[in-house]
């Protein structure tokens, strides 16, 4: 039998004991911080039905996920924690108390080319407030405050918190006449770090051109 050389797959993380202890301490700080602000821990399955994960992502998501079949089941590894959360709330909405405040710190998987800053397996540390209808604006303001205090607890001193609001983008797309294409435009912009500003600019101007208006500086 040929000898198998041990290796770690590209884009996957393995830590030596000392670093693993440090990492676990960081995760514990996150858990304590999130719990302190009234968020409940949640752990959703790493494997979901592929149709659930692909429900709103479209073709671009299909390119990113690890997908496989087991018997008659079409399955996939979760690529984020948001879609599993949506499924969880839809499934258990009659048993939950709203606003539902949850946190989840778990691994997610992306079937894309590994490169600097982009892994195939990595952790996400999410906090979300799910309302039964509309949420108070204080919930929006609370999240950056929690992030600030959590980063401070981790010992970070120099960091930026970038805030965005989907309503601002929706208003911009309405002005540009791109309401029906909003999802495609945002998925293109989301590739900024992956493919670079020049390619993003080319896609925006070639595929989503608006007469008399350039998207180059948006």
Task: Please identify what each model-predicted range represents.
Residues 2-216:
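Extended, charged alpha-beta segments that form solvent-exposed binding/catalytic grooves
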């Amino acid at each position: 039998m040929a000898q198998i050389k041990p290796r770690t797959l590209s884009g996957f993380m393995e830590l030596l004991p000392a670093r693993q202890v440090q990492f676990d301490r960081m995760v514990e700080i996150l858990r304590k911080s999130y719990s302190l602000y009234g968020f409940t821990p949640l752990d959703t399955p790493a494997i979901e039905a592929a149709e659930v994960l692909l429900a709103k992502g479209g073709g671009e998501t299909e390119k990113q996920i690890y997908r496989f079949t087991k018997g008659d089941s079409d399955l996939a590894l979760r690529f984020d924690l948001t879609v599993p959360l949506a499924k969880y709330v839809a499934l258990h909405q009659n048993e939950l108390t709203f606003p539902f405040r949850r946190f989840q710190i778990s691994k997610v998987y992306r079937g894309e080319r590994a490169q600097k800053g982009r892994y195939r397996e990595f952790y996400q540390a999410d906090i979300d407030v799910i309302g039964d209808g509309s949420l108070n604006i204080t919930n929006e303001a609370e999240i950056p405050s929690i992030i600030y205090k959590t980063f401070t607890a981790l010992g970070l001193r120099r960091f930026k918190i970038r805030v965005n609001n989907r309503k601002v983008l929706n208003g911009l797309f309405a002005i540009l006449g791109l309401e029906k294409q909003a999802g495609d435009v945002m998925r293109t912009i989301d590739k900024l770090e992956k493919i670079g500003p020049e390619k993003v600019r080319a896609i925006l101007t070639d595929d989503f051109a608006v007469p008399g208006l350039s998207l180059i500086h948006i």
